Each structure stands twice: as structure tokens, then as C-alpha cells.
């Protein structure tokens, strides 16, 4: 059965807006797990714009389910991951000027660097996932890199303006799931997933984990973290 990986980056974004200690993503992660999230996701960016090293250190000790660390494939980040040992690392592209991750990794262009990072992480006992667009050639390259999983970038699906466009994106995602499964890779998905568009996506099957942050945090402001997480878990469970 598919699982929810709760991304708590936006809690850290609110905290950093005032430079204080609240709200604390560590507390949000604990509440999320109590409500049914089966993993916690954080993105430690090179510019530390939201999640801080302190958050990673504490979450590594307190998360009871699975900690998924999103990060760039840099020497610094690989060293941090090998020291803190999250259960999973998801390699993602980074641009300093972007508000959020805008697209998948270009694994084809950066195959050597990504393969080197994947090997170091896996040698350290960490499961590795690559955040990629639902592109057949990128998935083939991801498999060559030695990664265990792909995380399908669902942004184009989430941004589709109408059902015909959304349906085309779903077909691409479905083909990506099938190819990854064929070559023995696990499949996760994330980016732009909300309480409406999760249903057709989850109905495809083949996705092990949905990493969702913004839509859950937006709802949590209005109804509380417990209700927001439980609502999403229910949608994933009964899609």
C-alpha cells in the first residue's frame, strides 16, 4: 500500500521568515507521524533557506518512521548524509534563484557525478532515489547510475490546466512507473500534489510513496496538522 512522506520544509520557511525558533519542523514531523505519515522528508539546501543543519541533526534522532533527505549531489551534502545516515537520500537539482525545485535531475548530462554520489551513499548503507521527470531516457540513465528508486516529478501533471492535459501527463507518469518497475527500481512521486489531484495519480498504482508538503501545510493552517495529514493518508489509502 502506498505511503505518505510528509515534507516539513514549509514549516521551516515560516520560522526563517522571522529568524526565530517557531514553528519548529521537528515538532511538525512528530505530529505528522502521530497522524499517520509513514516518512518525513526535508530538503537541506545549499543556501539553507529553510531547513537548517540543526533540524537534520534532531530529526535524525527523533523520526520514528523513515527520514528522507533531499539534497544536491555535492561533496558537502554527500559528506553530511554519510555522517547523519538518513534512511533515504533523494538527489534533486538546485538553483539558488528558484522558489522551489523546478524540474527533475538531468541524469543523462550529469551521469558520472550522480553515479559517483549514488555509489558513495549506497556504500554508506543509504537508500538512494533520484528526482526525475517522467522521461524514459532519464529513467534509463537513473537505472545506470545504480540508484534504488526514482521519484517522479509530478509538477507538469499538477500544473496541467484541464483534464485532457492532465490525462496526457498521467499517461507519461504511468509509462515511467512501468519502465522503472521493469528495470527493478522502486517508484516514489512528488511535487504539486494536493487533495484533488492525488486521486487520479494514486489510481495508477505502482507508486510506493508520495512526498507531499505544501498542500498539507496549507490545510494544516486552517484545520490543524492532525486533520490535514489524516485527510491525505485517507485519500492515498482509498484511491
Swiss-Prot record:
Molecular function (Gene Ontology), one example: pyridoxine 5'-phosphate synthase activity
CDD domains (alphabetical): PNPsynthase
Record keywords, A-Z: Cytoplasm, Pyridoxine biosynthesis, Transferase
Keyword Transferase attached: yes
Binding site for 1-deoxy-D-xylulose 5-phosphate: 9-10, 45, 50, 100
Entry function: Catalyzes the complicated ring closure reaction between the two acyclic compounds 1-deoxy-D-xylulose-5-phosphate (DXP) and 3-amino-2-oxopropyl phosphate (1-amino-acetone-3-phosphate or AAP) to form pyridoxine 5'-phosphate (PNP) and inorganic phosphate.
Family, similarity comment: Belongs to the PNP synthase family.
Protein name: Pyridoxine 5'-phosphate synthase
Organism of origin: Pelobacter propionicus (strain DSM 2379 / NBRC 103807 / OttBd1)
Amino acid at each position: 500500500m502506498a505511503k505518505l512522506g510528509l515534507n516539513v520544509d514549509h514549516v521551516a520557511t515560516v520560522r526563517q521568515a522571522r529568524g526565530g525558533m517557531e514553528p519548529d519542523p521537528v515538532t511538525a514531523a512528530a505530529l505528522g507521524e502521530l497522524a499517520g505519515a509513514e516518512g518525513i522528508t526535508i530538503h537541506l539546501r545549499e543556501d539553507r533557506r529553510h531547513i537548517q543543519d540543526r533540524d537534520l541533526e534532531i530529526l535524525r534522532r527523533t523520526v520514528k518512521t523513515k527520514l528522507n533527505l533531499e539534497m544536491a549531489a555535492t561533496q558537502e551534502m554527500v559528506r553530511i548524509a554519510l555522517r547523519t545516515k538518513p534512511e533515504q537520500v533523494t538527489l534533486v537539482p538546485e538553483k539558488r534563484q528558484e522558489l522551489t525545485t523546478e524540474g527533475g535531475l538531468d541524469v543523462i548530462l550529469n551521469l558520472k557525478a550522480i553515479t559517483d554520489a549514488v555509489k558513495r551513499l549506497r556504500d554508506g548503507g543509504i537508500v538512494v532515489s533520484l528526482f526525475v521527470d517522467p522521461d524514459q531516457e532519464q529513467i534509463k540513465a537513473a537505472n545506470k547510475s545504480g540508484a534504488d528508486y526514482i521519484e517522479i516529478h509530478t509538477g507538469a501533471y499538477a500544473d496541467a490546466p484541464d483534464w485532457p492535459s492532465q490525462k496526457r501527463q498521467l499517461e507519461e507518469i504511468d509509462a515511467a512507473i512501468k519502465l522503472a518497475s521493469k528495470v527493478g527500481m522502486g517508484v516514489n512521486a512528488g511535487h504539486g500534489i494536493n487533495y484533488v489531484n492525488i486521486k487520479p495519480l494514486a489510481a495508477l498504482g505502482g507508486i510506493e510513496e508520495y512526498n507531499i508538503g505544501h498542500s498539507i501545510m496549507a490545510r494544516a493552517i486552517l484545520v490543524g496538522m492532525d486533520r490535514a495529514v489524516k485527510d491525505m493518508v485517507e485519500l492515498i489509502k482509498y484511491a
